[in-house]
């Protein structure tokens, strides 16, 4: 299997590569169109603000490649947010538009934002895609 980690310019690529290697797959970190198009799986990592990430993706010519991808694509952290239409962060920025949703700041008085750490998973989605995503995860698992 050819797994590609997109070189977004705004992510901890070594940490993700290590995690993928633990699954028995040697990932390729790249921004090359041919590598991305020939991948079996694509990882879209991200750290920082949506605006900075979209600027970095655009400078690397990645938005259209990501939008055209037909392979399974996993957005991690900010990478998942980038799949939406628009983020209200830093005054608003257009995103990749692969998911019909806007990214909005959580209204969580008294809770630290951003939240980092481990939480138990309690899926509440009934769509076929969500059921597939959570197929082997029981409610309450880490």
Where are these regions (language model features)?
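Short acidic low-complexity segments
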Residues: 27-38
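Cysteine-nucleophile active-site neighborhood
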Residues: 48-119
């Amino acid at each position: 299997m050819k797994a590609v980690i997109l070189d977004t310019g705004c992510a901890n690529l070594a940490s993700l590569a290590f995690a993928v290697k633990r699954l028995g797959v040697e990932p390729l970190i790249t921004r090359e169109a041919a590598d991305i198009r020939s991948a079996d799986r694509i990882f879209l990592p991200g750290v920082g603000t949506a605006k900075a990430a979209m600027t970095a993706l655009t400078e690397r010519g990645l938005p259209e490649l990501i939008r055209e991808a037909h392979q399974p694509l996993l957005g991690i952290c900010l990478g998942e947010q980038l799949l939406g239409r628009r983020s209200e962060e830093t005054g608003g920025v257009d995103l990749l538009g692969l998911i019909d949703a806007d990214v909005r700041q959580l209204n969580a008085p008294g809770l630290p934002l951003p939240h980092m750490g481990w939480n138990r998973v309690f899926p509440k989605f009934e769509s076929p895609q969500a059921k597939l995503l959570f197929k082997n995860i029981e409610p309450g698992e880490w």
